[in-house]
Design a protein with these regions (language model features):
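Short N-terminal regulatory/linker segments that flank and modulate the kinase catalytic core
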Residues: 1-80
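Conserved ATP-binding/catalytic core of the eukaryotic-like protein kinase fold
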Residues: 13, 67-153
Length: 153
């Protein structure tokens, strides 16, 4: 998909739910002031302004610039950036929407869910991680699914 223009980018951002309408309106005004009006015609400049103001992350901006507006939320968590990807899953930095606690979320790809052995292995991993309690081992807080997307916090 070609890079969106400014109008399409703003529409994608609204549809994503990452920024509320008032925040977006204020950010657009400020971005145009800061760039002497250039942000209204340059989608990359607008995205950079939103990132520098902390309204979206670089990873979120890149996804929006690819024309994507879905996949930024898993239940009560907002995905901020991808930390890594392996053969079985991907790990993201996320933030709890209400508590603003940053966590790592391991997500099992939807195509792996169809294979019951992968899902069972994912659940066993979550149970094993939850049973461990040591200062040098990452603690597992939750395992859940959202519209068929299985994840561990």
């Amino acid at each position: 998909m070609p890079k969106p223009n400014v109008e399409t980018f703003v529409d994608l951002l609204e549809r994503s739910g990452l920024v509320d309408k008032d925040q977006l309106t204020d950010a657009l005004i400020e971005a145009n002031k800061a760039t002497e009006g250039r942000a209204q015609d340059d989608v990359d400049l607008l995205a950079e302004q939103l990132v520098s103001r902390g309204l979206i992350t670089r990873w979120q901006a890149d996804r929006l610039l690819e024309g994507r507006y879905k996949g930024f939320f898993l239940k009560q968590y907002k995905l901020l950036s991808q930390l890594g990807r392996g053969g079985m899953s991907a790990v993201y930095l996320a933030e709890h929407v209400l508590m603003h606690r940053r966590v790592a979320i391991k997500i099992l790809p939807k195509d792996r869910v169809a294979d019951s052995s992968y899902l069972a292995r994912f659940h066993r991993e979550a149970q094993a991680a939850a049973a461990l309690d040591h200062r040098n081992i990452v603690r597992a807080y939750d395992v859940d699914q959202d519209n068929g997307q299985h994840f561990m916090v």
